[in-house]
Design a protein with these regions (language model features):
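Short polar catalytic/cofactor-binding loops
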Residues: 9-12
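Divalent-cation-assisted or electrostatically stabilized phosphate/pyrophosphate-binding catalytic cores
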Residues: 17
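Extreme N-terminal starter segment of soluble prokaryotic enzymes
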Residues: 1-5
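Structural signature of beta-strand start/N-cap positions in the alpha/beta core
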Residues: 27, 42, 73-75
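Short acidic low-complexity segments
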Residues: 29-39
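Structural motif
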Residues: 44-46
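Cysteine-nucleophile active-site neighborhood
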Residues: 49-120
Length: 120
């Protein structure tokens, strides 16, 4: 069976994602350091929170380079998806750079409603 690594980037939804996977019959291992990604066949990077603290925690735990070097499928959820890009307007922070581009703040305008995302 392929090992699924669930990366702990300090996001509030780690437990929820793990529970959802368990309900689907998928066993996931929570990873808190770069060594935990060595034998992973799939990676999920969940997250609810802010980009700057999440990237700081990934750096502190030695996860940035292993995530960048990963050759297996990687799914980013919410903040995790934002962290896959080169940078983010939220905290003006450099991210993982796995996807080209910058996560930008949605701009409202006349007749254009912007959903509340927590940092607008």
């Amino acid at each position: 069976m392929t090992t699924l690594a669930l990366v702990d980037a300090g996001g509030a939804n780690l437990g929820s994602v793990r529970y959802a996977l368990e309900r689907l019959g998928v066993e996931a291992r929570i990873v808190r350091d770069g060594d935990g990604l060595c034998d992973a066949g799939r990676i999920i990077l969940p997250g609810v929170g802010a980009a700057a603290p999440a990237m700081a925690l990934l750096r502190e735990r030695g996860l940035v380079e292993p995530l960048r070097a990963a050759t297996v499928p990687l799914l980013g959820i919410c903040l995790g998806m934002q962290l896959l890009f080169e940078s983010s307007d939220e905290g003006d922070v450099a991210c993982l750079g796995l996807l080209p581009g910058r996560v930008r703040k949605l701009r409202g305008g006349p007749g254009l409603r912007v959903p509340h995302m927590g940092w607008n």
